[in-house]
Amino acid sequence: MAAAVVQLADLPFIRQFGFSPLVVGIVCGMLYGNFLRGTMPADWGAGVHFTARRLLRIAVAFYGLNISIQQIAAVGLPGLAVSVGVVASTLLIGTVAGQRLLGLDRDTAMLTAAGSAICGAAAVLAFEPTLRAAPHKSAVAVATVVLFGTLSMFLYPVIYHAGWLPFDTQALGIYIGGTVHEVAQVVGAASNIDPATTEVATIVKMTRVALLVPVLLVLGFWLRASAAAGADGKSHAKLPVPWFAIGFLVLAIVNSLDILPSDLVTAIRKLDVFVLTMAMTALGIETRFAQIRKAGPRVMALGLVLYAWLVFGGYGIVKLAT
């Protein structure tokens, strides 16, 4: 099924909207899981669960091969400052507003915030096993990435050409890369402006992706501390540190050292996208529409709040940093 999803995501009319195979995968998985689940052999259930949990962690670790220290250095201090500022503020706003203003549970609020703050569906996938969240919570979080990230692809070029973004090429690239949800959506938005902006935006976006590691480590230690104090009321006596985040960091360092043949790295990246697509499809199969309808409007409201922050708050952060 994941192989079919990858082919589907590569169709021109889907690719033009910046939908990654991960996004297409969860949609196809949800359609299958809700309308055709009766046709799935019972013994497939264990494989679906394994893919959505264990295989997911391995795939997130290998995503580190998309990052290098050289990329982070290329954007300089302004790009790094914007990335840190956007990620930290968006996670904080999403977690607090989601729980206190919109009445969402902790996991849904944090998954939605992660999708907006870091790298879209991939961040949701990385947070899900660390939080031990239910699959339907990941699905609704990804829905906000699809909606508002796609909107950015069309909105940003329009407001730039209207003269409402008074940035030079460097600052404009930092703004787009620092505030749009998915990597593909960043490329889609910036490519409608010019190649130089696209290059800067892509590098800044990958800097945000690199921040996934420290964020996951902080999250893991915070959850352990909360469990030890009994603060969240759950039984997490042996809550693990997200070791796949360590793997992500190690592989990013390996990629920075340029010790692997380029053809091998390219092949691993393609395989990793496929495995991430498998994991996202499996999450979709485990998700029920009734679960999404229950929290849907409030999650979308949180997605809108975070999107407004990215557009306007991100503008202010870029102005201060550049």
From Swiss-Prot:
Task: Name where it mostly resides.
Answer: membrane
Keyword Transmembrane listed? The answer is yes
Q: What does UniProt give as GO cellular component?
A: plasma membrane
Keywords of this protein's UniProt record, alphabetized? Cell membrane, Membrane, Transmembrane, Transmembrane helix
The subcellular location is:
Cell membrane
Q: Does the keyword Membrane apply?
A: yes
The entry's family comment says: Belongs to the UPF0324 family.
Name the chain's protein. Answer: UPF0324 membrane protein BB4178
